[in-house]
C-alpha cells in the first residue's frame, strides 16, 4: 500500500512537472507575442512612414449563408471614408493604425478603428506589386447593437501596386448573421 502511494506521488509529480514546463512555455510564447504586438503598434504610432486614405469599396453577404429576402434588404455599397498611418518593418511587413466609418448592412454608420498587420510579399520583378496576408485587431460599433464597442479580430488580405492597395477581410458568422466579405481601397501618401 505504501509503495503504491509513493508510485502515485512520483507519477503525479512528474505529470505536474511536465505540465508546469508546458505552462511556462505557453506563457513565454504569449508574452513574446504580446511584446511583439505592442512594439509594432508603438513603432507604427511613433514613426509612421505614410499617411493613408481609406475608401470602403464593397460589402458582400455570403449567398450560401443568407436567405434571399434578407440579402435583398441589405446594403452592399458601404460608402464612407477613413484615415490611418502605416509603417513597414525591417522585414518589409505592413503595420497600420486606422479609423474608418462606413454605411453597414442596414445603411447605418459603423465606425471601426484598430491596428492591422500583414506579411508582405513582392513576388514579381516589379517591386511595386505586392501581396499581403495578416490580421486586424480593433473595435467597432453598430447601430443594431446600440453602438456598444465590440472588439474584433479578423483576417486581412491585400493586393496592391505602389501606394494603392485593395485590402479585404471576411467577418465569420452563423446563418443569416455575419459571413460578410468587406473590402476597401487604401492609398498611402
Curated annotation (Swiss-Prot):
Coiled coil: none
Signal peptide residue numbers: 1-23
Protein location: Cell outer membrane
GO molecular function annotations of the record: acyltransferase activity
Primary location group: membrane
Site feature location: Role in the phospholipid gating: 175
Alphabetically ordered keywords of this record: Acyltransferase, Cell outer membrane, Membrane, Signal, Transferase
Positions of transmembrane segments: none
Enzyme Commission number, as recorded: 2.3.1.251
One Pfam family hit: PagP
GO biological process annotation, one example: lipid A biosynthetic process
Site entry: Role in lipopolysaccharide recognition: 70
Biological role: Transfers a fatty acid residue from the sn-1 position of a phospholipid to the N-linked hydroxyfatty acid chain on the proximal unit of lipid A or its precursors.
Family: Belongs to the lipid A palmitoyltransferase family.
Complex and partners: Homodimer.
Protein name, entry field: Lipid A acyltransferase PagP
Organism taxonomic ancestry: Bacteria, Pseudomonadati, Pseudomonadota, Gammaproteobacteria, Enterobacterales
Amino acid at each position: 500500500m505504501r509503495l503504491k502511494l509513493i508510485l502515485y506521488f512520483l507519477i503525479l509529480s512528474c505529470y505536474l512537472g511536465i505540465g508546469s514546463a508546458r505552462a511556462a512555455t505557453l506563457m513565454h510564447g504569449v508574452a513574446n507575442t504580446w511584446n511583439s504586438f505592442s512594439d509594432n503598434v508603438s513603432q507604427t504610432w511613433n514613426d509612421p512612414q505614410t499617411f493613408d486614405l481609406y475608401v470602403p469599396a464593397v460589402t458582400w453577404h455570403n449567398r450560401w449563408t443568407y436567405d434571399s429576402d434578407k440579402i435583398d434588404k441589405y446594403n452592399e455599397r458601404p460608402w464612407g471614408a477613413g484615415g490611418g498611418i502605416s509603417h513597414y518593418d525591417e522585414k518589409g511587413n505592413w503595420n497600420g493604425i486606422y479609423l474608418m466609418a462606413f454605411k453597414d448592412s442596414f445603411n447605418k454608420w459603423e465606425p471601426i478603428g484598430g491596428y492591422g498587420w500583414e506579411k508582405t510579399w513582392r513576388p514579381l520583378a516589379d517591386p511595386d506589386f505586392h501581396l499581403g496576408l495578416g490580421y486586424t485587431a480593433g473595435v467597432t460599433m453598430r447601430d443594431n447593437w446600440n453602438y456598444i464597442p465590440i472588439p474584433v479580430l479578423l483576417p486581412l488580405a491585400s493586393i496592391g501596386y505602389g501606394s494603392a492597395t485593395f485590402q479585404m477581410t471576411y467577418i465569420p458568422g452563423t446563418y443569416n448573421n455575419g459571413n460578410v466579405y468587406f473590402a476597401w481601397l487604401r492609398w498611402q501618401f
